[in-house]
Amino acid sequence: EMCIRDSLGIKYDPSHSFVHGGDKGAYLKEGMEWGDKFVYCHVKGVIQYGDSHEPSEWKNRELMVRHPELKDELMGDFAADRRYYDNPPAGIDSINWRAFFAVLYQHDYDGYLAIEPHSMTWQGEKGEKGVKYTIKYIRDLML
């Protein structure tokens, strides 16, 4: 008899292991542990300068929801300067996509791959070129 837990899947984004304060290689560990549950993966590059500031934003999230007028003050430097990380195209970022795909193949992943361009730097024509670069780069990793 199948239980609900067996029928649930995970939408996974390896870049979140970086910007949410995780160990830089956490996405590989998470993939090894949970990859058999992945049903949808985001393909979004990330580069990060120093430690993540994002966990402090989440601490204040409930307060910001109740008092949106205080959002800028509560977020402090995080709101004013998000330059401690960016989301360049996959393949010119910090994620080891070859190793991540090896983990996906280990689990016989056959789910979706979604390119997710959120960069503040890669906008307009540069953003379009970045998406094309990501498509080419990821295609080369597909068997």
Residue spans for each PLM region:
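A short pocket-lining beta-strand/turn micro-motif at the edge of beta-sheets
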Residues: 37-39, 86, 97, 108-115
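C-terminal helical cap(s) of enzyme catalytic domains, especially alpha/beta-barrels
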Residues: 125-143
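A generic secondary-structure signal
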Residues: 30, 103, 137-141
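A short, acidic, flexible beta-alpha connecting loop/helix-capping segment that sits on the rim
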Residues: 114-130
